[in-house]
Every structure is written in C-alpha cells, then in structure tokens.
Amino acid sequence: MNTQQLAKLRSIVPEMRRVRHIHFVGIGGAGMGGIAEVLANEGYQISGSDLAPNPVTQQLASLGATIYFNHRPENVRDASVVVVSSAISSDNPEIVAAHEARIPVIRRAEMLAELMRFRHGIAVAGTHGKTTTTAMVSSIYAEAGLDPTFVNGGLVKAAGVHARLGHSRYLIAEADESDASFLHLQPMVAIVTNIEADHMDTYQGDFENLKQTFINFLHNLPFYGRAVMCVDDPVIRELLPRVGRQTTTYGFSEDADVRVESYTQTGAQGHFTLARQDKELLHVTLNAPGRHNALNAAAAVAVATEEGIEDDDILRALESFQGTGRRFDFLGEYPLEPVNGKSGTAMLVDDYGHHPTEVDATIKAARAGWPDKNLVMLFQPHRYTRTRDLYDDFANVLCQVDALLMLDVYAAGEMPIPGADSRSLCRTIRGRGKVDPILVSDPAQAAEMLAQVLTGNDLILIQGAGNIGKIARNLSEIKLKPQTSGDEHHG
C-alpha cells in the first residue's frame, strides 16, 4: 500500500489505517458485496468467499478482490478483520480459523457503521421499500451534484452497481432490521418506511420487541438528527410519541408534514403532488409505478428538502429514476406467436417482493398501470416460517391475479413445516374460488406451464426472493419460448 493510498484511508476512517486486508465470508450477497466494493475503491485489500460466482463476485473481482468459491481456513490468512454475513453459521471453518488466530470477526453492519462514523449518514430502515427509497435518495443527491457514497441491498440500475464510493461527506445506506444489526449504525438522518411483523425469529416472536428495536435504532440519532417516518403506517403512528428526536412525517394522511396528493398512474409512471410545510407544491412525475413508490419518493423528498436541495434537482431525479434490480423490473415485451401460437404480446416483470404487503403493492401497481392486461403471476414463497406465519395474508393477496402458478417454497436453509408448503397454499387459494393455482414442482417446466395460461394480452409477474430471479432471466433470454422435449406444438 503506497503513501497516497494510506493518506486516502486516513481521510475516510482515520483509525482504520491500521487495517490492510479485509476478508468477507459470504461476499456474494448484495449487502456484503456493496460494502466490499466501497472498501475496495477506498484502497483496502479485499478478499472473500462464497459458494458460487454471481454478478456481485464478478464485479468485485474486476476491482482486484480475491474471491474463493469455497470456505477454507486458509482463506482468512493475513486478514486484519473478517466480516461475516448473518447467513453464515458460527462453525464455518473460516470463522473458526479467524477466532483461533485472534482476528476480529464482525458483522457487516459493524463495518457499515465504521464507514458511516466520519460521514453524514442517511440510513433507510423499514420492513418494505428500503432498497428503492435508498436508491431514490441517492439519485436525488447525485442529481444535485453532492456525489454521495451509497450502499444498497439491491442493484441501483442507473449506476449498474449495488454500491458506489463518492467523494463527499454523504453516505446513504440501507439499514437491515432482519438480524437487528442496524443498531450498530449511528446516522444523522434515519428514514423508517413502515414496520410489520417479519423476521420474527430474531425478535423471539415478540412484536413489541421488534417495535422497541426500531425505537432504539432511532435513538442512535444525535439529538440534532432527524427521523423521517411514514405516518400512514399504523405502527409508526403509534410509536411517534416515543421517538425522542426531531421528526418529519410523510404519507397520504392529512396530517403528514410531506403529503402525497392527487396520485394517478399511467403505465410505469406515477403522477402526484407533494405538499410540504412552508414550501411550494411539488408536482412530481415519478418513473416508478404504484402508490407505494409515491411514498418512497415522499421520504426521499423529505430528506432532500431538509438538506436544502433545489426542487428542480429533485424533480429531475425522480422523473429519470431507473429503479433497482428486481423491484418491478421490466425485462421486456415479447410476441406470443412463437410461444403458444397466439397473437399478441406478454410483458415480463421481475419483482423481489416476498411479503404479502409487498406482493399486494406490486399487484396494485400492475393493475393501475395496465388495467386491461391479463395478470399472470409465477410466485415462489420464501421460507416455511414466513409462509406459516402469514399464510392467510398470502392466500388473500394471491387471489387477486387472473392466473397463478406457484413454485415450491424456497427454504433458505429451513426445514419443511407441515401445512406451510406450496401445495397447501394452492389448495387454500383454490378453495376460495377466485383463481385456480397451478403448482410447478419442477422450475424447468415454468416456461411451458406459463405458455398454457397466456392469452395474448398479458403481464407476467415473476415474484419472490429466492432463486426465482434466475427463472425470470431465463424466460427473458429465451424470449418466453417454452422448453419442450420432442413436441414442438404446445397448446
């Protein structure tokens, strides 16, 4: 490491100049990879391990990181610190080796907190909408010439990366409540989009514990910091009196400090007015569909307005917003004639939403923007515990589409739970009489089974957080043509 690189490190995190080599266990995850990318660009030696290559590991390798596709004790040799994903168990051989060598082992949020320590941190928390809101704040700050650093849990499509090192004092980051590690962060501004029961295993199944953890997170703000909170959310409204910090509220509610009014949607664009205290009305065109995205934009505008960013910069950023990967992600519109012999087209949209509230928001956005389309969903439930805990909510939400295909539950390391599987969920939905679900036990048959339900005027939602995104990409690459064996005619 040369003198210039050392000087650069001292300017970012003064005491971290003692650190040379940072190793990440589970480096291919979006949150881990984003932090690794920022640190690589700051001049640190980066290494990491994961089970298989993906776009995140490819990007890091292009920046000079050493990537191992195995977990072995020798991978942590010479590391100054080991950063571990919450998905990694404590008996991982690299973790064991690090402890034996007395190398510090920390969670990703602790490293993110160090990056934030000497910057003006803006942390975006909440059950839903974190990734998109983080990208919106980052886009506005970039449009205003503020050159922020950002670390996001999803791909920021305009930048083509999950994270980027800026050269200003601003750091905008997604704050993850799934393992309560966001308590390590000490931002200047915190957004909370909403609070629902999710990741309840972290909170001992106690919703009060989850709510108190969000309060504790907000109390990490300095007394002169600001909490920006969605007052439409009933839990946030309940908690507001307990937030001992300056607050700005936003939402469709009449008493919101930043109020969304007159929302309409045309295709993928939302149009609405934002009313702000002691400011001119802001007439917004947002290049992202759905009322939920209008709320995300309102949060971003609240932060930008507080920072003194010009309205013209805000409006330009929102109108040109390119979204994030796997959040109502348009993959194309394809002719159906090669697929099933029918005339017309099918739009293909990939979406990460895996909680009933998120799936409902995606369906509503699709209905509002394309009301005449036949709405077809290929859904992959994520985790048996979530399917069990939110079973009735899933059944109610999934009844809203015109045709439903369902993959088996993506276990994410969990053991099956009787009655919380896709077959049971299909049976329950079928019993409600609104839609007749099709169980797709073999993902390789997804294209062929989709072809059976397409009408010629379709919007296909590929929905879920597991490996279903690969199916979406495969469908787009084969232009929706079914994979048939021998028989080229499929009706």
UniProtKB/Swiss-Prot annotation:
InterPro entries xrefs: Mur-like_cat_sf, Mur_ligase_C, Mur_ligase_C_dom_sf, Mur_ligase_cen, Mur_ligase_N, MurCDEF_pg_biosynth, UDP-N-AcMur_Ala_ligase_MurC
Enzyme class: ligase
Enzyme Commission number, as recorded: 6.3.2.8
One MF term in the entry's GO annotations: ATP binding
Keyword set, alphabetical order: ATP-binding, Cell cycle, Cell division, Cell shape, Cell wall biogenesis/degradation, Cytoplasm, Ligase, Nucleotide-binding, Peptidoglycan synthesis
SUPFAM superfamilies given in the database record: MurCD N-terminal domain (SSF51984), MurD-like peptide ligases, catalytic domain (SSF53623), MurD-like peptide ligases, peptide-binding domain (SSF53244)
GO cellular component: cytoplasm
Residues annotated to bind ATP: 126-132
One of the protein's GO biological processes: peptidoglycan biosynthetic process
Domain of life (superkingdom): Bacteria
Record bears the keyword Protein transport: no
Subcellular locations according to the entry: Cytoplasm
Pathway in which the depicted protein is active: Cell wall biogenesis; peptidoglycan biosynthesis
UniProt record similarity statement: Belongs to the MurCDEF family.
Role, per record: Cell wall formation.
Protein's UniProt name: UDP-N-acetylmuramate--L-alanine ligase
Lineage of producing organism: Bacteria, Pseudomonadati, Pseudomonadota, Gammaproteobacteria, Enterobacterales
